[in-house]
Amino acid sequence: MERCSVAQQFEDRFHRKFYYLRLSVTDVCNFKCTYCLPDGYKPSGQKNSSFLSVPEIKRVVKAFADCGTSKIRITGGEPSLRKDFPEIIHTVASTPGIEKVATTTNGYRMEKQVGQWRDAGLTHINVSVDSLDSRMFHQITGENKFTEVMRGIDKAFEVGFEQVKVNVVLMKDLNSQELPAFLNWIKDKPIQLRFIELMKTGEMDELFDKHHVSGVAIRNQLIANGWLLKVKAVNDGPAQVFVHPDYQGEIGLIMPYEKDFCESCNRLRVSATGKLHLCLFGDHGVELRDLIQEDQQEQELIDRIQAQLQTKSVSHFLHDGNSGMTPNLASIGG
């Protein structure tokens, strides 16, 4: 079997092509967000040394790039907690075929380190800011770091990022009333604000029942006020992005409970311990680590991934109350 080419890339039985890999490099996080790790990070018994090494990351990324993947998002946990994070960015960015290197961060280390990340090759950045009210931010994240995170976003613009994406997990009775404040914030800033519906995971049933709210009301409000839906690029994520002539910023909505959400799925996930996850809400991960120990194993790695893609479901089963085996969003990178 020949190596993948762009004409022969990772594709499932529903003819979905996979241009986008979410690569977790740690499941450790220093925040205690109510919707993810409300009790803080608890080690699963494995040592941090069991997270993917830089050479292993290089082999994973090369295999995906050779099969048409052009965008890699480095996730966690909190990826910047890895001391070799700039080296990881450089390794990903220097892989032929990779055009976009993104990360998602809680922003805690951005003010001091975002310049290093950009120099290493980071092209896109997402920051979690679940409230513009510092007290509510503290309540949701468990950390009183609102000012530091906001300074980090300013620093990202200073070092040359043209746009910063800001993730907001939408929660009824906590931050669901903050749309006017968020709109005011992005009026003159090139921020893409992304409202993400709260998702049910294994440990979060009660929180979901109490705080889940659909993004449909926000979408209707945006459309009524002249916001227009933007056309997606091939390696974009699932967000419905809206633009307005009077705003420098943009609004994105991620609504996993929306009909046909999975129809345009274009991403795969690899966990920090080297398991392939076909879906955030899948039932299991597939071991890849035994095939990323030597460069010459690449074809075996590609073959295993391609074989697994033929088992990928057409959709998640969230509507049936089945969120798979994902205990929390930190465990495989959200």
From Swiss-Prot:
Its EC number is 4.1.99.22. GO terms for molecular function: 4 iron, 4 sulfur cluster binding; cyclic pyranopterin monophosphate synthase activity; GTP 3',8'-cyclase activity; GTP binding; metal ion binding; S-adenosyl-L-methionine binding. GTP binds at R22, R73, T104, K165, R267, L268, R269. [4Fe-4S] cluster 1 binds at C29, C33, C36. InterPro entries: Aldolase_TIM (IPR013785), Elp3/MiaA/NifB-like_rSAM (IPR006638), MoaA (IPR013483), MoaA_twitch (IPR010505), MoCo_biosynth_MoaA/MoaC (IPR050105), rSAM (IPR007197). It is an enzyme of class 4 (lyase). GO terms for biological process: Mo-molybdopterin cofactor biosynthetic process. Binds 2 [4Fe-4S] clusters. Binds 1 [4Fe-4S] cluster coordinated with 3 cysteines and an exchangeable S-adenosyl-L-methionine and 1 [4Fe-4S] cluster coordinated with 3 cysteines and the GTP-derived substrate. Pathway: Cofactor biosynthesis; molybdopterin biosynthesis. [4Fe-4S] cluster 2 binds at C262, C265, C279. Residues 13-239 form the Radical SAM core domain. Monomer and homodimer. Belongs to the radical SAM superfamily. MoaA family. Catalyzes the cyclization of GTP to (8S)-3',8-cyclo-7,8-dihydroguanosine 5'-triphosphate. This is GTP 3',8-cyclase.
